[in-house]
């Protein structure tokens, strides 16, 4: 039986509360009054200065350094407002700040009414008796976050709380762990340092006689009793349709209207679903499982990690969020992890995830650091967590809370060179913050979801070890993060056979059309100051080229701009191939237990999106353009996948299915193609095999040497293996896939394919013709927003037709004029 429990907590103002919005035009001034201008609230200082022409685009070239002074200054916001007499006569008046970034002192009519020190929480200040008949003056003095963090760090004299500063390559600010602010705003290895200041969410005056509703929340309970309490009400529904993740069923959302006599009513969406994080013994394994069960069904999570969409949150639009989430869904993703170094996303993000069936792994905003545990810090964190859980727990898309990103691992593997004698002190602080406070609040506020203290973690095994495991990366338990940039990513045996891969990935550069918006032509060289400046990951550019060079000949055009464009292309090829190999390994490991490891039930590659135009691990560029990786994700996250590997000289092909009940009868079709001909050298077809529902099944195994001998006229270097799954009747049921038998850099017979297009026809179809087989065929239309139905593909026929879906009005002529076509053999 399904019920929903409604909780009323004394906000949603309506009939019983008079609201005066204070959003709109304010005045903004810096500390010495040398800068004074009109500002929009919600907003931030950087955006205001740019809109008023005081500065240019902060993302342009080296402006992140040139505009550092903005974050080092203090700023004052001022507004005037009047209150109607009939409103002023009510009993109570409260000023509500939904979000201040970050440290501020607020005064009304010259009287200090409160202070803020946390950008992640709402502040309410009672101003009854302070309102005037005439104009009221409201001022918000915002202190430099950099200065505040430094002062708090230096005041913490008993022991250090590392890290002090980010690596020099990040060009960032220090002591971000001492301020409750987006940790990445002081810099990260994929983004700039812009420690923003401002009133980043709405401001309003609420006037009322008695009380007001602060929030409505709902939770799903399974109970046969109907109980009515003073503060909540259980409502029984005889029959409801469940909410399912994308690819597993419909996302049923119900309109729920709540009428409160005091204040009127409100209508919002509710849904019904259950979630469990299953950690239980596995036969033939010394560890525990780690997987999500939604509505009683095990679900393999397929997705990525989400970082802030923009350094300046006031510039994040609904369209930007929608494009990214739709892109995730189009890539067959059913999950995203909101990473703990950014922000709790805005309401529209979670509402869209509810609609699209995208499950959310929600971190709390602590990342890659240790944190202080003074009383005032703990107090503001407790309020932050309480507010965020109450705000988000009604969303069916949110399926798990996680206390932090990598902080258990930071202590366990000694990131910060803490002495053995001092370690217990830091473990105590860790337990105090994440277990005794954050976990305690979450369990009180929301009993319907699992809570993990950290990621990666060994889950219940970490708990047994006092919350900090000896090895939080142990693949027998919990989730893992894994990065290795110098090992050959084509060697799938090097990847951990983990229960759940919540972070992994490789860098690439975004397209030239994306970079050109923030650079000049002299920057378009991998050895330029711009290329070095934009790379915030130590040795990142070298790692990309070294990894690419293992399997590809690097571009050698004598035209510097063309060489730059080609090098960008080769980094995207490398990234797509590396992540594909790793992801397919995880997907076909879901049914395996080998040496106690396996039963992988989730892959969230790092990362979905970008915060600016620069090199990163993303599959979608800043602005929404898909990298090659994202196109490939649509295939390696397909509901039914054929995945091939070479193991001990054998070609193994697995059939992987996300289905819960249907066993698919499939044939595996394998073709060997020569690089010098469109005709298959030979073809093989397996007998009909059943793919296990919700599992992985070996559907084809053959000695590669025997296969080459059997086919004749093929060597590892001269041929490629293409394969797919079909029904017994021959219908395609998995994406086409392929496996190289040697590195493409050693390919024999691979020629320049001379790809041409016949122009764009109605509905934006592009027909391609080539003279020889081509690999990694890439179509780019520069700045025209949209995406192709396939891209970065293997072209084994003389003709191929691709569809472009535009995100804005365009013409065939515009697309044709901007179309660039590249294949691997074209870059050397």
For the regions a language model picked out, list residue spans one by one.
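Active-site neighborhood of glycoside hydrolase catalytic domains
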Residues: 355, 371-464, 623
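Active-site-adjacent substrate/metal-binding segments within catalytic domains
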Residues: 52-97, 101-117, 179, 205-206, ...
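Substrate-binding clefts and catalytic carboxylate motifs of secreted carbohydrate-active enzymes
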Residues: 18-21, 27-35, 40, 184, ...
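Accessory beta-strand-rich segments of carbohydrate-active enzymes
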Residues: 12-13, 17-20, 24-33, 45-53, ...
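Terminal connector regions
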Residues: 242, 260-266, 701-753, 805-828
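Aromatic-lined substrate-binding rim segments of carbohydrate-active enzymes
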Residues: 125, 132, 335-381, 439, ...
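Intrinsically disordered, low-complexity Pro/Gly/Ser/Thr-rich segments with frequent PxxP/GP/PP motifs
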Residues: 227-241, 668-716, 784-811
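Extended acidic/polar, glycine-enriched regions
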Residues: 129-137, 224-284
């Amino acid at each position: 039986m399904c019920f929903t429990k409604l909780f009323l907590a004394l906000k949603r103002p309506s009939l019983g509360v008079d609201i005066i919005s204070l959003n709109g035009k304010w005045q903004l001034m810096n500390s010495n009054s040398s800068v004074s201008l009109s500002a929009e609230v919600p907003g931030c200082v950087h955006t205001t200065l740019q809109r008023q022409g005081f500065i240019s685009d902060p993302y342009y070239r080296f402006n992140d350094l040139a505009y550092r002074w903005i974050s080092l200054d203090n700023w004052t916001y001022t507004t005037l407002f009047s209150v109607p007499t009939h409103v002023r006569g009510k009993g109570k008046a409260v000023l509500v700040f939904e979000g201040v970034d970050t440290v501020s002192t607020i005064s009304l009519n010259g009287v200090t009414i409160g202070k803020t020190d946390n950008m992640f929480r709402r502040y309410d200040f009672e101003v009854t008796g302070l309102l005037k008949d005439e104009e009221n003056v409201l001022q918000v003095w915002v202190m430099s976050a950099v200065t505040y963090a430094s002062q708090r760090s230096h005041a913490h004299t008993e022991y250090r709380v590392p890290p002090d500063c980010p690596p020099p390559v990040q060009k960032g600010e220090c002591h971000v762990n001492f301020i409750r602010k987006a940790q990445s705003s002081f810099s990260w290895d994929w983004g700039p340092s812009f420690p923003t200041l401002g009133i980043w969410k709405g401001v309003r005056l609420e006037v009322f006689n008695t009380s007001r509703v602060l929030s409505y929340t709902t939770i799903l309970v399974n109970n046969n009793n109907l109980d009515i309490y003073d503060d909540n009400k259980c409502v029984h529904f005889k029959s409801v349709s469940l909410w399912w993740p994308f690819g597993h069923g419909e996302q049923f959302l119900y309109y729920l209207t709540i009428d409160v006599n005091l204040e009127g009513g409100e209508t919002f969406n509710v849904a019904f679903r259950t979630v469990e994080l299953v950690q239980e013994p596995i036969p033939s394994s010394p560890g525990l499982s780690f997987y999500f069960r939604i509505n009683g069904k095990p679900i393999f999570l397929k997705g990525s990690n989400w970082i802030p969409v923009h350094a300046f949150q006031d510039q994040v639009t609904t369209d930007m969020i929608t494009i990214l989430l739709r892109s995730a869904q189009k890539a067959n993703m059913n999950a995203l992890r909101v990473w703990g170094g950014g922000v709790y996303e805005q309401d529209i993000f979670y509402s869209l995830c509810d609609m699209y069936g995208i499950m959310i792994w929600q971190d709390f905003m602590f990342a890659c650091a240790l944190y202080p545990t003074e009383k005032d810090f703990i107090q503001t964190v407790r309020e932050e967590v309480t507010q965020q859980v109450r705000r988000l727990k009604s969303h069916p898309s949110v399926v798990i809370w996680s206390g932090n990103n990598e902080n258990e691992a930071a202590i366990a593997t000694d990131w910060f060179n803490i002495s053995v004698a001092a370690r217990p002190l830091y473990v105590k602080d860790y337990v105090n913050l994440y277990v005794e406070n954050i976990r305690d609040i979450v369990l009180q506020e929301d009993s319907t979801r699992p809570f993990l203290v950290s990621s990666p973690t060994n889950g219940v095994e970490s708990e047994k070890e006092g919350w900090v495991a000896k090895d939080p990366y142990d693949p027998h338990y919990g989730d893992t993060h894994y990065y290795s940039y110098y090992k050959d990513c084509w060697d799938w045996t090097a990847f951990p056979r983990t229960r759940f891969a919540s972070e992994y990935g490789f860098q690439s550069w975004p397209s030239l059309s994306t970079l050109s918006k923030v650079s000049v032509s002299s920057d378009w060289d991998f050895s330029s100051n711009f290329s070095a400046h934009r790379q915030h990951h130590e040795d990142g550019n070298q790692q990309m080229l070294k990894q690419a060079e293992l399997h590809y000949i690097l571009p050698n055009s004598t035209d510097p701009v063309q060489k730059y464009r080609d090098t960008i292309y080769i980094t995207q090829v490398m990234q797509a191939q590396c992540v594909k190999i790793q992801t397919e390994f995880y997907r076909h490991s879901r049914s395996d237990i080998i040496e106690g490891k396996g039963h992988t039930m989730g892959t969230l590659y790092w990362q979905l999106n970008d915060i600016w135009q620069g090199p990163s691990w993303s599959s979608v560029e800043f602005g929404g353009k898909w990298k090659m990786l994202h196109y490939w994700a649509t295939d390696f996250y397909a509901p039914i996948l054929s995945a091939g590997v070479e193991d001990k000289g054998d070609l193994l092909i697995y059939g992987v299915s996300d289905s819960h009940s249907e066993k698919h009868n499939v044939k595996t079709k394998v073709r060997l193609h020569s690089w010098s001909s469109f005709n298959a050298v030979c073809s093989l077809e397996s007998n009909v095999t059943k793919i296990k529902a919700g599992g992985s099944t070996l559907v084809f195994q053959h000695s590669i040497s025997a296969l080459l001998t059997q086919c004749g006229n093929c060597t590892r270097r001269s041929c490629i293996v293409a394969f797919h799954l079909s029904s017994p009747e021959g219908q395609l049921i998995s994406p086409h896939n392929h496996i190289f038998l040697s590195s493409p850099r050693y390919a024999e017979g691979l020629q320049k394919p001379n790809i041409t297009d016949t122009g764009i026809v109605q509905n934006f179809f592009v027909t391609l013709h080539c003279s020889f087989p081509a690999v990694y065929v890439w179509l780019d239309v520069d700045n025209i927003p949209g995406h192709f139905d396939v891209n970065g593909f293997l072209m084994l026929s003389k003709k191929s037709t691709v569809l472009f879906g535009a995100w804005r009005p365009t013409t065939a002529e515009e697309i044709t004029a901007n179309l660039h076509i590249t294949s691997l053999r074209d870059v050397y």
